[in-house]
């Protein structure tokens, strides 16, 4: 075979192969499911290719800067103080300890903020539908003002109010001899665990476990037989009596460290910084405005015949709302409510604007600046916020599945 014959045969072979390949692609593209699979394969390949390019670029740049990738810096001394801490911490503690302190501060703001925003949002959502003209319009203007002002301005406003208008410690707003509010923050009694605290913890866990399983049993019994049990009364008695009995039997395993004014400030007790109070108020008030509209929409989604039927049975308006309207409205309220909880948690990262030492201020701020580990610290911050958000979503999805209608 001459070289010319070989080239001719190779040319025809390539043409035939290309034709077969083109026909194959055309047949795949015409088939809907095959086309979907092909597009997904292309997208996945592009994503992994881009990710691989980023990793390669990162390694090259790290080598050029004579830096290495790792998390060993977390075990080095932090060398800075944190103004509010829920666990023991000093400037000699490690960076990972500082990150945990910041994470707990973030979690504290998120939990307290979610509770306050939910309570305020539900109340405002109901008031928005009130027949009282003044109450309805006050709630309306509050919601419109809060929703249309950036959250950062809310935070700065409340911080300025607390710092500049709250009294000095000597003239602090007092509730009895155990709670004080001043421009230095909020001072509360701090519980101190003593010998026998394990029995109290066990009793609390057992009480909540009883409430959970008894409530499910009572609901199942009512659904199958129509018999109603006094669930609220029994649960309340168990929640109070079981821990109380354990407390008394263990010889008072918890003591209180009360705050007391000494000199120019309070000493002892639990100290919540003014930054925490301002941040929590701002996030709660801002998010409550959105929750109020969600609650209002959920109530309006319930057919008016439900209210009319309940009123025809002689139920008072408050009982109609709590027993008939809100239980049904939950199915509409919960999905968007989850988004607001996530927004509140993520908005707490703005705490750095007023000096509250949360996760972003500790791990994503001072630790980053001291160690120069930008990639590692940001990856950790992003991962932690992702875990928190997924945890909230899982909890709310579980609650949503427990209240949704079940098809028979």
What residues fall within each predicted segment?
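Intrinsically disordered, low-complexity regulatory regions of eukaryotic regulatory proteins
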Residues: 1-3, 21
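N-terminal amphipathic/hydrophobic targeting modules at extreme N-termini
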Residues: 3-12, 150
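Transmembrane alpha-helices and adjacent helix-loop boundaries
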Residues: 16-408
């Amino acid at each position: 075979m001459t070289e010319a014959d070989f080239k001719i045969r190779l040319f025809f072979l390539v043409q035939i192969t290309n034709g077969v390949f083109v026909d194959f692609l055309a047949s795949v593209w015409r088939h809907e499911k095959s086309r979907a699979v092909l597009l997904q394969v292309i997208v996945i390949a592009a994503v992994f290719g881009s990710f691989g390019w980023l990793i390669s670029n990162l390694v090259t740049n790290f080598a050029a800067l004579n830096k290495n990738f790792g998390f060993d810096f977390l075990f080095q001394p932090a060398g800075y103080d944190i103004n509010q801490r829920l666990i023991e911490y000093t400037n000699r503690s490690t960076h990972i300890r500082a990150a945990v302190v910041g994470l707990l501060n973030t979690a504290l703001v998120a939990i307290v903020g979610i509770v306050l925003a939910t309570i305020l949002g539900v109340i405002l959502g109901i008031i928005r539908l009130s027949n009282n003209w003044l109450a309805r319009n006050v709630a309306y203007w509050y919601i419109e003002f809060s929703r249309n002002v950036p959250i950062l301005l809310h935070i700065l406003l409340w911080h300025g109010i607390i710092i500049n208008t709250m009294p000095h410690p000597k003239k602090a707003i007092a509730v009895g001899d155990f709670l004080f509010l001043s421009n230095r923050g909020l001072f509360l009694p701090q519980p101190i665990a003593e010998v026998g605290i394990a029995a109290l913890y066990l009793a609390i866990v057992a009480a909540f476990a009883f409430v959970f399983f008894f409530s499910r049993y009572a609901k199942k019994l009512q659904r199958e037989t129509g018999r109603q049990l006094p669930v609220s009364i029994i649960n309340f008695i168990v929640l109070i009596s079981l821990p109380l009995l354990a407390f008394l039997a263990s010889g008072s395993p918890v003591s209180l460290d009360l705050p007391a004014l000494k000199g120019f400030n309070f000493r002892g007790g639990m100290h919540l910084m003014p930054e925490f109070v301002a941040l929590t108020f701002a996030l709660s008030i801002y998010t409550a405005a959105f929750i109020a509209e969600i609650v209002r929409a959920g109530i309006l989604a319930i057919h008016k015949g439900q209210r009319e039927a309940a009123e025809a049975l002689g139920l008072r308006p408050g009982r109609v709302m709590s027993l008939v309207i809100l239980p049904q409205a939950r199915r509409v309220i919960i999905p968007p409510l989850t988004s607001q909880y996530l927004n509140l948690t993520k908005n707490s990262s703005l705490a750095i604007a007023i000096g509250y030492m949360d996760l972003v201020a500790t791990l994503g701020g001072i630790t980053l600046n001291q160690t120069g580990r930008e990639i590692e610290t940001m990856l950790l911050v992003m991962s932690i916020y992702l875990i928190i958000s997924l945890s909230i979503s899982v909890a709310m999805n579980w609650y949503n599945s427990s209240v949704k209608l079940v098809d028979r």
